[in-house]
Amino acid sequence: MIYDTISDMLTRIRNAYLVKHETVYVLNTKINRKISEILKKEGYIESVNLSTNSLQKLEITLKYLGNQKKPGITNLKRLSWPGLRFYSNYKDIPPVLNGMGVVILSTSKGIMTDREARANKVGGELLCSIW
């Protein structure tokens, strides 16, 4: 049984990039769906679809750059996990690579990126960082 679906999703994506898979399947939860939609919107992955094999899986198509198939994501890092939560107000959200990366937060207004949280002036739990 998987207790931390976010860490599981990030690990599956990271491992799929390491072996250069085209697609990866992750559990279909609301938070995984929202995080994968943010990754798509930010341009880190190609697409997100419900799996045709099972309704409990999300099919994520990974993005590679150039002919050498460089991964679209350099690093995925889980910032807050079930045993240790990290919270931040909108003024103290840490920048990732001076704004080149993205921090994904869980706020009272939903799951959003660090830029959206600063614009809406809401803080929340730091879920993960991507660059």
Swiss-Prot record:
InterPro entries: Ribosomal_uS8, Ribosomal_uS8_CS, Ribosomal_uS8_sf. GO terms for cellular component: chloroplast; ribonucleoprotein complex; ribosome. Keywords: Chloroplast, Plastid, Ribonucleoprotein, Ribosomal protein, RNA-binding, rRNA-binding. One of its GO terms (biological process) is translation. It is found in: Plastid, Chloroplast. One of its GO terms (molecular function) is structural constituent of ribosome. One of the primary rRNA binding proteins, it binds directly to 16S rRNA central domain where it helps coordinate assembly of the platform of the 30S subunit. Belongs to the universal ribosomal protein uS8 family. PANTHER family: 40S RIBOSOMAL PROTEIN S15A. Part of the 30S ribosomal subunit. This is Small ribosomal subunit protein uS8c. The gene is rps8.
